Amino acid sequence: MSIDRLAAFLADARQFRTIPIMRKFLADVIEPLQVFANLREEAVFLLESKDDESPWARYSFIGVAPFLTLESETGETFLIKDENGNVQMTASTLKEAFQAVERALCVKPLAEAAPFTGGAVGFLGYDFISAIEKVPRHRAPDLAMKAGHFVFCESLFAFDHEKRELSLIHYIRLKGHETMQEKIAIYRAAEERIAALAAKASRPRAEQPLLPAEDEAERAALFSKASSNYEKEQFLRDVEAVKQYIAAGDVFQAVLSQRFSVPVQAGGFAIYRILRHINPSPYMFYFRLDGIEIVGSSPEKLIQVRNRRAEIDPIAGTRRRGRSPAEDEKLADELYHDPKERAEHYMLVDLARNDIGRVAKYGTVEVPVLMEIGKFSHVMHLISKVVGVLDDDIHPIDALLAAFPAGTVSGAPKVRAMQILQELEPTARGLYAGAIAYIGFDGSIDSCIAIRTAVIKDGYAYVQAGAGIVADSVPELEWKETRNKASALIYAIEQAERLFAKGEQIVC
């Protein structure tokens, strides 16, 4: 035990009740998947960036041993529970709940370069919108998903892939009345806990079955075991209904979606491992929360807040990557000059400007990047960047809710589009089109849209995908688009089931 570190802790303990201590390790021979598998009894989330072509793919995070949760069934009241599930406090909003936790914990700030060093991690379901906008609750919330669920973890593993460095951050929690000897004992126990976690995390990786190669024939039969919440003919009729609303001037666009359910025996971690291989994305995540598993590979940021600067990166327009540099450039040029893609993208940039404008200081909203080609491992998109500086009386959570949900999964204007979708879609969306997010003690937020996401619950995996309906949409093509968007996750589920059937279970 370092005397200097102990002295620093004792000094901090005079001012703070929750004190982070951090140890750094070289991460040249371990990686996030291995660490999560080794800590599977206590780990509750894994956040990764798994696209080497993406500028966002630098950090990954693993949360261990949650000690507080923020939960809400409808978004109108949040319960703050301890690690035993006992309600400690209640709050009427997410912001009030987070601020109550901050006051109770009295956390010492941590000077560290990583964008997230501790705080709340979890999700807001799409149906949370009914608590903050004039959007009626859906008539059929059949999955009974919480509107919001966040965890605060005692220990956090933060990978910096650029530096090949791992930071292990452990939060010591004091009650405020400990004696000097008790504080020293608590600090020693924390040092031992860090050493034990580091040793466990770095164990050799358990033997894992080889992943099967992608099979085009299997891809063709993907949906044979999947059931939809929509009959095809009803979906086609609802596309026409949206077009009628567009013709009447209610909306410019609405994103109609369908949900697929697939029976599963394999665990969510097996599905996640396959998904990260076949569909790497800037935002990848795996959660185990309250009896459900969440697996996702989202390409799209919802909003990011760093040093009170908010950023939204609208994405619209997609092409596959070329098989050669020449084809890649040809496809990029085709995408950039496609008038329909450009029109949709401009609409989403306007939505982002409006969302940030609701919380930013006057005159600070800018579009430093407009309609550039962003290339990822498998696809390319039209990407813009909208930024603004938060007004002085705005909390970062206000910015998160101003952007929620994204226009790319709802429509424009957003509120009217969502009202129409609640009327037409046969079941509540649950997590789909909501947000996966972290909210740092330092006021930082990063979040992605909950698309390309599966919820595993009660023996079924649920995957939902939507298509943006506009005035000239062809119903049959929109039906196909929803299936195409769901195909990577359905394929990952099918492959995990094949391994399970062979008895080749993936550890975790």
From Swiss-Prot:
L-tryptophan binds at S49, P282, Y283, M284. Mg(2+) binds at E344, E481. Heterotetramer consisting of two non-identical subunits: a beta subunit (TrpG) and a large alpha subunit (TrpE). GO terms for biological process: L-tryptophan biosynthetic process. It catalyses: chorismate + L-glutamine = anthranilate + pyruvate + L-glutamate + H(+). GO terms for molecular function: anthranilate synthase activity; metal ion binding. Chorismate binds at G317, T318, Y432, R452, G466, A467, G468. It comes from Geobacillus stearothermophilus. Its cofactor is Mg(2+). PANTHER family: AMINOBENZOATE/ANTHRANILATE SYNTHASE, ISOCHORISMATE SYNTHASE MENF. Pathway: Amino-acid biosynthesis; L-tryptophan biosynthesis; L-tryptophan from chorismate: step 1/5. Keywords: Amino-acid biosynthesis, Aromatic amino acid biosynthesis, Lyase, Magnesium, Metal-binding, Tryptophan biosynthesis. This is Anthranilate synthase component 1. The lineage of its organism: Bacteria, Bacillati, Bacillota, Bacilli, Bacillales. Binds 1 Mg(2+) ion per subunit. It is an enzyme of class 4 (lyase).
